[in-house]
Amino acid sequence: YRAITDRIALKRAENDNLVNTTDMIFFKMFLEEKPDATISFTDVVQLMGGGTPKTEEESFWNGDVLFFTPKDVSHSPFCISTEKHLTTDGLNNCSSRLYPPFTTFVTCRGTVGNLSMAGVSMAMNQSCYALKGKNDFPPLFIYSFTRYVIATMKKKASGAVFSALVTRDFEMEKVFEPNFGNAILFQKRVEPPFSQILANTNEIQQLSKLQNALLSRLSSR
């Protein structure tokens, strides 16, 4: 049991280091020369919504479709499992689409301004936005770009807690104009660390399941 706990801690620390690496690459490529904020965040990023099907309709729930909510934000940049699941009928009867892997989610109610990236395809509830690059800006760039922009927004709020994020907040947020070629190059550079983070996140999930199984076995002795 101790060995599993240590392995999980090791993988989490490795992920933290890899995220720091991607942050440093982003800083070097886009922020080092202190570019002026001349355009709106929504000139670069498209905001998309989610929705929840009727909770009392049993045929909509407990299927195979992952359903992201703010509760599913974890220590990892990637979300690979969710507390709730929809059926195909449930997905077809709510205002969320099925978002592809590497879609960035940002929480806009409850705990506001948390980020997660879909590790697999999943739907999403109405307490979040799903973000996609306009004009083919690639997904890993969008994640890191949004991470930087949200951190800037939080700094500007100078410690004040966001109560909610609405579309207008993103429309009003001025950002630097990213060079498309650099964004593509950034995507290529950070694909290896993000792939490793995703692999580690999958391993952590498997280890946690094993840990829980061991715990229940120990407690039933």
Model regions and ranges:
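Short connector loops/turns at beta-strand edges and beta->alpha or beta->beta junctions
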Residues: 73-75
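Short beta-alpha junctions and helix-cap segments that line functional grooves
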Residues: 54-56, 117-118
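A general structural signal for short secondary-structure junctions and capping/turn motifs
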Residues: 33-34, 57-60, 95-98, 121
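Non-catalytic DNA-recognition/assembly elements of restriction-modification systems
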Residues: 2-52, 62, 67, 71, ...
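Cytochrome P450 core scaffold surrounding the K-helix E-X-X-R motif
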Residues: 77-82
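A short beta-sheet element
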Residues: 69-70, 83-150, 154-157, 161, ...
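Catalytic cores of transferase enzymes with a strong primary signal for eukaryotic protein kinases
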Residues: 55-56, 66, 127
